[in-house]
Curated annotation (Swiss-Prot):
GO terms for biological process: aldehyde metabolic process. Induction: By osmotic pressure changes. Its EC number is 1.2.1.3. The keyword NAD applies. This is Aldehyde dehydrogenase family 7 member A1. May play a role in fruit development. It is an enzyme of class 1 (oxidoreductase). Keywords: NAD, Oxidoreductase. The keyword Chloroplast does not apply.
């Protein structure tokens, strides 16, 4: 068991125990559902046990959260921002421990685990400033002695369903904004990263208690698909944010839309990186390496398709294969490791199935392509030479597999970038301004993230994060994403004594 190991003593410092109730409901930790073991992907050994919530406990949590919403929405936005600031400070105090937990339970390397928690802290900082800027527009009225303007008000409760690959960052993108906008939050974390869900919730709960606020402002559930389905169906939750596959996201959207709720979807990515003949090859190769190999290929923004101009194709490919052949794969908590395991045994099996499909469609494995025999879920980062019209290229294989293809012209490369159902992230490497502006313009990439001379992954929190097409169309984190977490009213006030009608209508 994880708690028996000296190197796992830090777990106690963030409120975890060998056995943990997985529901934070009206200020109490409770759960009476199935007991699961959460394991380390590095060796598949148990870290701790977690009891998932029952449907009765879900209902109790929603009732208390709904009651707490009345208090929270009445608090001025800057006061709500102060609470989020304190949450950020609480996370800062436990940054190293939480980052280590993310690495242990999810499998990403320690630097990325710490970076993920840091991203939540940055979101808290962003949200604090935002709490004083939830401004509506003043609109000129065509009628004399009339004033027209917009007012933004809280929705009430925001449901956040997160995925295993970013077990706390995606919560931060949503919850920090939702809270300052005056909403309570109901969080269902991924079933395979429950300890991250519990540890982060404990810190938030301490801040609420210290400020004498209702604990149910933030409600958390560890559970399976039935809890996610309940959130999607619940009319008390006006907005549901879901991160996961396009297949499941389509089902969530259908359920939420049928009850006229709002959906914020962050779904599959099948991200392309284009290297033009005028690109800085060294910069491109380093970027491709991080984009394709980082987090063992399990980021939504991982580079999965690489399009190389035919004149530099072999040069870039040789350099890239050289990097792949010397990458350190191993325990994500060990210094120097760049590639940890994929998250579960099922992920490893999907990798194997994916390689078989690739070979059946004429793909040539240039490096990697095998699982690594061990107690953990380790696979080899893989580069595949394949035809751009192979059907497997249109799909998202969630692992460190990179498809490499040639192109001749910019127009061809853009068409290839846009040829898949997904539309999350994209990047081009070039030194020509006219290429850059075509790429980011109306005839360029159709993705939500359109980069130049940087990887497809590693987005900053200041910009809105999200994609188009089968990626779902949602936007989280920065820019004006906050507007999705509030309801907008257009208000017109007549402060005169006459009743002029719009459009000059004379009615009697």
């Amino acid at each position: 068991m994880g708690f028996a190991k000296k190197e796992h003593e830090f777990l106690s410092a963030i409120g975890l125990a060998p056995e943990n109730p997985g529901g934070f409901i009206n200020g109490k930790w409770k759960a009476s559902g199935p007991v699961i073991s959460t394991v380390s992907p590095s060796n598949n050994q148990e870290i701790a046990k977690v009891t998932e919530v029952s449907m009765e406990e879900y209902e109790e949590g929603l009732r208390s959260c709904n009651d707490a919403a009345k208090t929270w929405k009445s608090l001025p936005a800057p006061k709500r921002g102060e609470i989020v600031r304190q949450i950020g400070d609480a996370l800062r105090e436990k940054l190293q421990h939480l980052g280590k937990l993310v690495s242990l339970e999810m499998g990403k390397i320690l630097a990325e685990g710490i970076g993920e928690v840091q991203e939540v802290i940055y979101m808290c900082d962003f949200a604090v400033g935002l709490s004083r800027q939830l401004n509506g527009s003043i609109i000129p009225s065509e009628r004399p002695d009339h004033m027209m303007f917009e007012v933004w008000n809280p929705l009430g409760i925001v449901g956040v369903i997160t995925a295993f690959n970013f077990p706390c960052a995606v919560l931060g993108w949503n919850a920090c904004i939702a809270l300052v906008c005056g909403n309570c939050v109901v969080w269902k974390g991924a079933p395979t990263t429950p300890l991250v869900t519990i540890a982060v919730t404990k810190l938030i709960a301490e801040v609420l208690e210290k400020n004498n606020l209702p604990a149910a402002i933030f409600t958390a559930f560890c559970g399976g698909a039935e809890i996610g389905e309940a959130i999607a169906k619940d009319t008390r939750i006006p907005l549901v944010s879901f991160t996961g596959s396009s297949k499941v996201g389509a089902k969530v959207q259908q359920i939420v839309t049928e009850r006229f709720g709002k959906c914020l979807l962050e779904l599959s990515g099948n991200n392309a990186l284009i290297v033009m003949d005028d690109a800085d090859v060294g910069l491109a190769v380093r970027s491709i390496f991080f984009a394709a190999v980082g987090t063992a290929g399990q980021r939504c923004t991982t580079c999965r398709r690489l399009y190389l101009h035919e004149s530099i194709y072999q040069n870039v490919l040789d350099k890239l294969v050289g990097l792949y052949n010397q990458v350190k794969i191993g325990d994500p908590l060990e210094e120097g490791t760049l590639v940890g395991p994929v998250h579960t045994k099922a992920s490893r099996e999907n990798f194997e199935k994916g390689i078989s499909t690739i070979k059946s469609q004429g793909g040539k494995i240039l490096t990697g392509g095998s699982v690594i025999e061990s107690d953990g879920n380790f696979v080899q980062p893989t580069i595949v030479e394949i035809a751009s019209n192979a059907s497997v290229v249109k799909e998202e294989l969630f692992g460190p597999v990179l498809y490499v293809m040639k192109f001749k012209t910019l127009e061809e490369a853009i068409a290839l970038n846009n040829s898949v159902p997904q539309g999350l992230s994209s990047s081009i490497f070039t030194s020509k301004p006219n290429t850059i502006f075509k790429w980011i313009g109306p005839h360029g990439s159709d993705c939500g993230i359109v980069n130049v001379n940087i990887p497809t992954n590693g987005a900053e929190i200041g910009g809105a994060f999200g994609g188009e097409k089968a990626t779902g169309g949602g936007r989280e984190a920065g820019s004006d994403s906050w507007k999705q977490y509030m309801r907008r009213s257009t208000c017109t006030i007549n402060y005169g004594t006459e009743l002029p009608l719009a459009q000059g209508i004379n009615f009697g």
